[in-house]
């Protein structure tokens, strides 16, 4: 499907926000061909350096409400304390407090927050952040987030490999989300990294990552300098692959090199450059392996389908 055809189909492109300099980010979302509603949500504020993608689940407008709740809490935090981990936890509490949500109203989320020459990523579920860096061929595309999903737990435990995970029948089952459970606590994974000149971040729902191969994503990001065009072509690629789910993307370019060279600030409330939460993931892998060995895998299959 062509970029122009994508723009003709009912979907929303987020206007790139700028404060005088050329905008360096753009987002787009599309319901796909198989879903009546678009339960994804996205928001960005380039001036404040915040971007979010949320993928709602639950059906019958429940997912739409959940993803909107996530976005609203990120907006609130961007305008006040900039504590995005707390914002996701507030959204979790709000959804648990909704009488309709205890059973199945939930959302994934991936958030990017910029602090000087660094960016920080917060995520829950299987919405992803990728880092594209220039290089030979179509550059290098690296997945920065680790899915909170059943198949990722199997990969971490060594039960299956990533290739098997891509076609696993339970690849859409997630093990952590905002809302969607009766657990009052929510663990938010975080990582941080310095921007490098020429870098480009991609946030997306699984409507893109489950349909389009990383090589194709890297080619689109490398061949299209304009963020809006890149976002539209990513949507088009997912639609060409079948458009079986809602599709949402945000493309974010690194700040101007002059800004990078003049800033080394990291906020006091932001995590260290190393990804946090390794211990928790190791424990999860051990627990998963034990569950598989003990015949409790069926319990995991009862987790939220995505």
Name each model feature, range by range.
Residues 1-306:
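PP2C/PPM-type serine/threonine phosphatase catalytic domain
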């Amino acid at each position: 499907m062509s970029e122009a055809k994508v723009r003709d189909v009912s979907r929303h492109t987020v206007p790139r926000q700028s404060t005088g300099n050329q905008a360096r980010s753009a987002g787009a979302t599309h319901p796909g061909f198989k879903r009546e509603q678009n339960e994804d949500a996205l928001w960005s504020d380039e001036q404040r350096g915040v971007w979010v993608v949320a993928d709602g689940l639950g059906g019958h407008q429940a997912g739409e409400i959940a993803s909107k709740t996530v976005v609203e809490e990120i907006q609130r935090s961007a305008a006040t304390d900039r504590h995005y981990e707390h914002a996701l936890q507030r959204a979790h509490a709000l959804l648990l407090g909704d009488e309709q949500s205890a059973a199945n109203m939930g959302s994934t989320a991936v958030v990017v927050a910029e602090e000087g020459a660094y960016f920080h990523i917060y995520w829950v579920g299987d919405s992803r952040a990728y880092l594209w860096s220039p290089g030979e061929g179509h550059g290098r595309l690296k997945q920065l987030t680790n899915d909170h999903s059943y198949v990722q737990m199997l990969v971490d435990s060594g039960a299956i490999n990533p290739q098997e995970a891509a076609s696993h029948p339970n690849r859409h089952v997630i093990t952590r989300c905002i809302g969607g459970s009766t657990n009052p606590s929510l663990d938010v994974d975080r990582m941080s990294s310095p921007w490098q000149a020429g870098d480009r971040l991609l946030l997306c729902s699984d409507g893109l990552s489950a349909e389009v191969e990383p090589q194709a994503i890297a080619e689109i990001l490398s061949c299209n300098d304009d963020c809006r065009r890149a976002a539209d072509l990513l949507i088009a690629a997912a639609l060409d692959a079948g458009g079986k789910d809602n599709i949402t993307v945000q493309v974010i370019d690194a700040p101007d090199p002059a800004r990078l060279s003049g800033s080394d600030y990291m906020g006091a409330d932001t995590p260290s450059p190393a990804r946090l939460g390794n211990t928790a993931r190791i424990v999860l892998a051990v627990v998963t392996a034990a569950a598989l060995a003990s015949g409790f895998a069926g319990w995991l299959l009862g987790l939220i389908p995505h």
